[in-house]
């Protein structure tokens, strides 16, 4: 509750500054870039942010530390691969995305630069879902607050000095800050060392995807509706 209030307060302050510094056109452009990256990240996350929490919480509730370790390893390796693939696909399709969204190729280069956010977001979501699965509620709240603070402290100077040209750097730097924060807290988690043969990895990944992909589909429809 407290973290939600802080986030809302900081969000109101950021929104006010952004509106003044960027104007309606700049705010609209920032929102479109954000929505594009969110839509792609939703697909490339494969729903692991939902299924990962469920599987880790289940294994942790059974005090099965070895399975928790296997699931965590599977999630971490998968989000790296899917994030890299998503980034590459975004770069390849950047021209089409720009044309479809803005009816022009002018935004192709910014979308190429922003494609790294897909990877950064994937990794950050993976770390956060591990914390959620292990019920690190206090850490999640701190990550949320730091995310709002960092986003504000990064975006306002970018917009003040560069105007609309600061949108792309601010989004990338905010994603880096969010990843750094989540990684800082995720590193504190004690996970036992365990081998992860390919057979077991495939089994765990199959379990994660069987629940995650339908969740991803639902989330994609919600995100894509805002994009369209």
Residue spans for each PLM region:
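Short alpha-helical transmembrane interface motifs in multi-pass membrane proteins
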Residues: 36-41, 77-81, 108-113, 135-139, ...
């Amino acid at each position: 509750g407290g973290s939600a209030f802080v986030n809302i307060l900081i969000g109101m302050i950021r929104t006010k500054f952004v509106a003044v510094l960027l104007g309606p056109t700049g705010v609209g452009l920032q929102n479109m870039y954000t929505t594009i990256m969110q839509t792609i990240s939703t697909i490339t996350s494969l729903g692991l942010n939902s299924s990962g929490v469920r599987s880790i919480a289940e294994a942790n509730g059974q005090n099965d530390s070895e399975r928790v370790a296997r699931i965590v390893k599977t999630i971490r390796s998968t989000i790296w691969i899917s994030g890299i693939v998503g980034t590459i696909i975004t770069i390849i399709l950047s021209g089409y995305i720009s044309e479809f969204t803005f009816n022009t190729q002018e935004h192709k280069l910014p979308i190429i630069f922003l494609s790294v956010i897909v990877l950064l977001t994937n990794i950050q979501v993976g770390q956060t879902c591990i914390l959620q699965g292990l019920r690190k509620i206090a850490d999640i709240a701190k990550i949320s607050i730091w995310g709002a603070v960092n986003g504000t402290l990064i975006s306002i100077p970018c917009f003040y000095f560069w105007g609309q040209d600061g949108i792309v750097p601010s989004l990338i730097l905010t994603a880096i800050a969010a990843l750094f924060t989540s990684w800082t807290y995720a590193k504190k988690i004690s996970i036992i060392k365990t081998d992860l043969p390919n057979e077991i990895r495939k089994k765990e990944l199959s379990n994660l995807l069987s629940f995650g992909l339908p969740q991803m589909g639902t989330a994609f429809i919600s995100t894509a509706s805002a994009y369209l």
